[in-house]
Amino acid sequence: MIKIKMRNNCSRSKNFIKRIEQFGADIEFDEKSKIVFISDVHRGDGGYSDSLRQNRNIYKAAIKYYLRNDYTLIELGDGDELWKNKNLADIAYNYKDIFKILSEFNKKKKLYMIFGNHDMAKADKDFILKQEKIFKQIGRRFGKDLLNLYKNIDFYEGIVLKYIPAGKRILAFHGHQVDFMNCDLWRISRFLVRYIWRPMEGIAGFKEPVSPSSNYDKGTKIDMMLEKVARKERKIIICGHTHNDIFPKVSEGLYFNDGCCVFPSSITTIEIKNGLISLVKWRIEVDNNNILFVKKNIIGGPEKIENYFEYARNL
């Protein structure tokens, strides 16, 4: 039976850090652990407004690599696009192969799912039951890969990761908690995206103004606010939401952002392995025989996690 750790509401006025520390998932890890953070996948309906469509194969190659190499996958919010889409039916149909891979992570107890503003509906305790009823109206076995996963996993607002060698904690959450339009007013923003911006998407380069990923100045302000949260808490925090991949130098900050999966021709992730943290880009390349392949590059780090803990201690 699915357990939800927060009702589908959001307010910047509440102390969301304490809420995450109290109700979030707890993960202990050490220098032998391998963890990957991926956010803002925005799995959609396969149509023109499906932001993942162009990077589907890159994303699939990345998660297959992480499954094969025994990583714990933390989906850090906005995994499914539930602002543009009223339910999961088209998403379940178009991404059957993806949900099969994610289910393999879950069978190994190596999958954690965080909800963001675009999939806040997952915080509703009856959400999966409602989706199951919709699927049954379509066909008896429709959406079985998605349902097999979502009926057997918890959705959290955030995760507390404890690094055993140092006895220090890392906080991971989507990041919309500091964004008024996408937290307090998320239902209004969803309405605007679903019924106004989506039909206009693609027309003369139109972008939804409520999205930090479509508004660089807004995204940067949110990133600055999240860095302030990290300094105030004196903790490493890892977020998504703004789609801006961020990897600070040890002496510069404690706020990391894993970027997104929807920018043209590449996706970004954050990896923790051997006590080191790295920012990784996956993209399409062409070899000398004109064959396309997916290439993984480290674009930030690797840096020792303990160096950031030491920096936080001296703030």
Where are these regions (language model features)?
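Extended recognition/assembly regions associated with phosphoester-bond processing machinery
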Residues: 1-75, 79-315
